[in-house]
Structures are given as structure tokens and as C-alpha cells.
Amino acid sequence: MKRFLSIALMATSLAIITACTKDDSPNGNANLEHFTYTIQSNQWYTRGVYGSLGWQYYSQIDIPDITKDVMENGAVMIYIKQNDLFYPLPAITDEDGWVNTVQFNVYLGQVEIFVEDTDFQTVAPGAMTLKIVIFNKLKSLPAYLDIKDYKQVLSYTNK
């Protein structure tokens, strides 16, 4: 499963433009911003001691639109592209009793994506395509909106 996930991510990402692009339509919702970003295979770094707890691959993406106001009143959701669909992070897969996770941290002006396995032998992720959604004001979102469902978020963004 780890190998399948890595291969699927690499194959899918080869067809994607590698630049971070802001989806900025004039009809979009002012409370949401969304970006497509592809982390290239050479943009992954390692942290920790191989074979030990905490060994992981990570990549950092600068996003100036993650402001103090977003940190205090909004939210950031990230979706990973797998097999032409987007799934919310954290993404967890299980193979032969070992668990692979793709997670993220949000900082002022930046997000960090990290990948690790419970067997402490994480394989380099390769290229990974993400959708990053910034909710500027959570209180202004409708109750029916499931922010874990990228299609709902995209539909709401384009209202």
C-alpha cells in the first residue's frame, strides 16, 4: 500500500503544473481562498533518526495569506490529490499493520506537510499535489458546509 500510494502520487502529480496557483475568480466567496500546490520530489527534507520514532519527511510552503487574523478567526484545510480526487488531511493508510500518515501544521505565513510511517522507515513521498483552502472567518460560514468535503468547499467558494 505504501508503494501504491507513492506511485499513485508521483504518477498523478507528473501531469500537474508545479507552480502554486491562486484560484482567484471575481465571483468567488470573499471568506475563502484556495490554492493548488505541488510539492516536487526534491522539496522533501528529513527530520529525526532513520528507523526511530519521529523519523519523517516534511516540506514547507510559504503562504503569505495565512495572516494573524486567519490564525485567530479562520482556519486552513489541506486536501491531498489521490486518483483524481481530493481527500482531507490528515490522510491515513494502513498496509500490513503499518500505518502511513500525511499531516500538516499551520504557521503564520506557512504550512508544513509531513509524512511518517509507524514502522519508522518512511519512504520518500515523491511529488504530491495539494489543495490549500484558507477560511478567513469561520463564524461567517454556513452550518451545512462540511469543510472536510473539498467538492462542497469548492462549490461554496464559487457562489
Predicted regions and their residues:
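First exposed extracellular module after export/assembly in secreted or surface-exposed proteins
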Residues: 28-159
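Repetitive helical segments and hydrophobic/amphipathic motifs
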Residues: 11-12
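Bacterial Sec-dependent N-terminal signal peptides
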Residues: 2-5, 15-39
